[in-house]
Amino acid sequence: MARETEFNDKSPSSTDDGMSQSHFSDKLKNLFHFRRNRAATVSTSVRNDQRDNDSDDSTFDINVNQLNELDLNDSSDQLDSRPSLRRVSSAPDSHKGVEAPPPRPLINMSNIRKAQVKILKNPGNYIFGRTEYGKRTYSGNSTKISRVEVTPHSFEKIRLLGQGDVGKVYLVRQKSNHRLFAMKILNKREMIKRHKVNRVLAEQEILTKSKHPFIVTLYHSFQSRDYLYLCMEYCAGGEFFRALHSLPKHILPEKDACFYAAEVTAALEYLHLMGFIYRDLKPENILLHQSGHIMLSDFDLSKPISIVTHPTVVLPKHSTFSQEKPALDTNSYFSNFRTNSFVGTEEYIAPEVIRSCGHTVAVDWWTLGIFIYEILYGTTPFKGKNRHATFSNILYSDVSFPEYHGAPNVSSTCKSLIRRLLVKDESKRCGSVAGASDIKQHPFFRHIQWALLRSMKPPIIPKIEDGMEAVEPSDNDNEEEDFLNSQYLISANLPAVDMHSSTPVNEQSNPFDSFSSVTLHHAGDE
């Protein structure tokens, strides 16, 4: 949940959750002034995370049509007078004027005694949602959805894993079987206030439908009067971001970067085939399973399409790269589909998003290029001294690669893929012809056996003793309010609305009516 930055171009007439761009611009036009007349502005907001506890929900007007090199030295640029958006991989808290905290160790056995965790003779059989990676079949009929079988009282809270502006994530243990889960608890009042109801509904839809080894698994979802609960697989390896920053220079050798890029590509391909644009790829949103394989998480910025078409096949002669077999066209699902939402992470945002001209599934391939660059070089390619400069670089600067003495050794083949993924024109970007098939056919992945990714040994294996990560109880007694003291909705048969409102319940609309309270059984987990 670290370094989480969100931009929102909100339009009441669109299917995305939020307010109109012009409304924000009119309301905030006196806050910031640039020397030049602006042709167009976009609104941005800061989404806080566990390392940014400011509750400031500030918005900004920033010029995207007149960014140029002269603007980078413009002393009238007032953006830096506001809280900086998070996106400095080496110092995520630099905007606060404090030293970035060191990466949390993957294992700290001294804290286990604090948690008073009972380690049984064979803890792997009961601690994790999956006892052995790859045991699940992921077949189309491997998931059984039934009426929810748990309540908040079915779990014991161990500690707080992270928090955002509308909720928290806890490490919990199910009392009946001692299995560990990550439970996301979202405050309904805050979601309504911040116009994020549709986002959690989209996230639940993705988690409920997904059956993929590189996407985090949902086991239970339910709600109380005041909160929504998503009980998901606990990835004991933690954030990929933290694992990366525990390495020398915070980088990976090219061979290892290729492995993780391949797993991310496979996960994105699956999401696209399911009709979802991810839109927020970054190391913080990638978790490490205890086996070392990756799992994508945090789908609240993802965009589902309303109508999913049948897939098509691209013949070899039409493919971007030479290949022996026809390629499955994952782009065909998004034919004639564009969305105007302004969402993402500052240094990962694609040019078409900044220009507010609408975007397609191609934004995911842009973020893949940024991701590969970052894990190879320890920084992102277009990062500027401030947000204004970063956006200018994204729009107008070509990607460059460090060539100083001691710079990471990266092959021309790898650089070729990064350049192809970071083409400004989305219609010419790698992936524009057949989607994921284009990326998978690039020579950079020539040694990857895509069907056997789950069987490959990951470069980073989390050091977890006795099946446990460092676990310790939280010292904040107020956290019990959202965990146990909420009135359980299903058993009490209460409406999913704000019970504290002065408006009678029968007159309130129910924005959470489509939030499904279900339990999912996965073949291979029992």
UniProtKB/Swiss-Prot annotation:
SUPFAM superfamilies: Protein kinase-like (PK-like) (SSF56112). Residues 446-526 form the AGC-kinase C-terminal domain. Keywords: ATP-binding, Cytoplasm, Kinase, Nucleotide-binding, Phosphoprotein, Serine/threonine-protein kinase, Transferase. InterPro entries: AGC-kinase_C, Kinase-like_dom_sf, Prot_kinase_dom, Ser/Thr_kinase_AS. The active site is at D280. Belongs to the protein kinase superfamily. AGC Ser/Thr protein kinase family. This is Serine/threonine-protein kinase ppk22. It comes from Schizosaccharomyces pombe (strain 972 / ATCC 24843).
